[in-house]
């Protein structure tokens, strides 16, 4: 840990189409090999498809999907006296968003649909309906934390 000063988080510019910082972060997570315009095209196409399917606008549907995937608790390994315990800890808000976005992108990449935009649209619509792989991942993390609640006093 540095002794001089703590460096603050970088300010992220909102995306050009919707003006949302969350969406800009999502584009950055989806981006591969620095191809931002490709990632933006995929995300915007997926949001367009999502808006056609649901009665909400694209950004609202995206935020509902993200909200359903955000974890509140996770487990961290903690070594105490030669044995390792999975200690449940609360997830900070910035990390909640980051994990949710990462899980949605991972789940979309594993799907078997034709294009990435379609995969992403399907995963986002599943997440908005509280189903799908990303939501299952959140449920698994919550289940692990619930199962290891006995070790919560090892929190640091």
Curated annotation (Swiss-Prot):
GO terms for cellular component: small ribosomal subunit. It comes from the Bacteria. It comes from Enterobacter sp. (strain 638). InterPro entries: Ribosomal_uS7, Ribosomal_uS7_bac/org-type, Ribosomal_uS7_CS, Ribosomal_uS7_dom, Ribosomal_uS7_dom_sf. Keywords: Ribonucleoprotein, Ribosomal protein, RNA-binding, rRNA-binding, tRNA-binding. GO terms for molecular function: rRNA binding; structural constituent of ribosome; tRNA binding. Belongs to the universal ribosomal protein uS7 family. One of its GO terms (biological process) is translation. Part of the 30S ribosomal subunit. Contacts proteins S9 and S11. This is Small ribosomal subunit protein uS7. Pfam families: Ribosomal_S7.
